[in-house]
């Protein structure tokens, strides 16, 4: 039986009831950091005002967005806009990142660019193909910068 939309939990970050954990409007962590705490499964949930980019570098993920399930076995970025019900099941050898952006940050970026970030407006899955090395480097740098600023 499918859960009613009102019974789907709304989180800032999955499994946390606290306010946003950083003064920034950005959060970055490895997929294993949180998913390993939940036996490699992130149950269906949603975020009121957060955009998420799930970057699967390697391993396997079952991605569910709004009831549609897809098996991911290649380097892929999954975009999840605010209020979309989503959940994941990961293999234990999963490698990758979750980048979470607060809606005010996205609005600020859109204002500075003078255009909406259409790629963030709808859920989508994008195989990274030849851009894999560059994305690996960018996400690694983001995580290092985020973890460095969080501990400062």
Annotate each language-model stretch with its function.
Residues 117-152:
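Amphipathic alpha-helical segments enriched in hydrophobic/aromatic residues interleaved with Lys/Arg
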Residues 83-105:
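Ligand-binding loop in jelly-roll beta-barrel domains
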Residues 1-64, 70:
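Generic protein-terminus/edge-of-domain signal
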Residues 67-82:
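Short acidic-glycine-tyrosine-enriched beta hairpin
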Residues 80-84, 120-122:
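Short acidic (Asp/Glu) patches
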Residues 57, 73-74, 92:
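A cytosolic small-molecule/anion-sensing beta-strand core signal
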Residues 104-124:
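Double-stranded beta-helix
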Residues 80, 101, 130:
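A conserved hydrophobic position in a structured secondary element of the catalytic/binding core
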């Amino acid at each position: 039986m499918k859960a009613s939309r009102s019974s789907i939990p709304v989180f800032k970050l999955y499994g946390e009831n606290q306010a946003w954990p950083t003064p920034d409007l950005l959060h970055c962590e490895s997929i294993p950091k949180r998913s390993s705490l939940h036996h490699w499964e992130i149950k269906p949930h949603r975020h009121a005002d957060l955009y998420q980019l799930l970057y699967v570098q390697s391993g396997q993920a079952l991605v569910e967005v709004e009831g549609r399930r897809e098996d991911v076995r290649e380097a892929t970025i999954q975009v999840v806009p605010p209020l979309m019900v989503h959940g994941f099941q990961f293999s234990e050898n999963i490698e990758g990142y979750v980048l979470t952006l607060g809606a005010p940050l996205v609005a600020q970026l859109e204002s500075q660019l003078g255009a909406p970030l259409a790629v963030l407006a709808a859920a989508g899955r994008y195989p990274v193909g030849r851009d894999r090395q560059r994305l690996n480097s960018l996400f690694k740098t983001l995580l290092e910068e985020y973890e460095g600023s969080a501990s400062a």
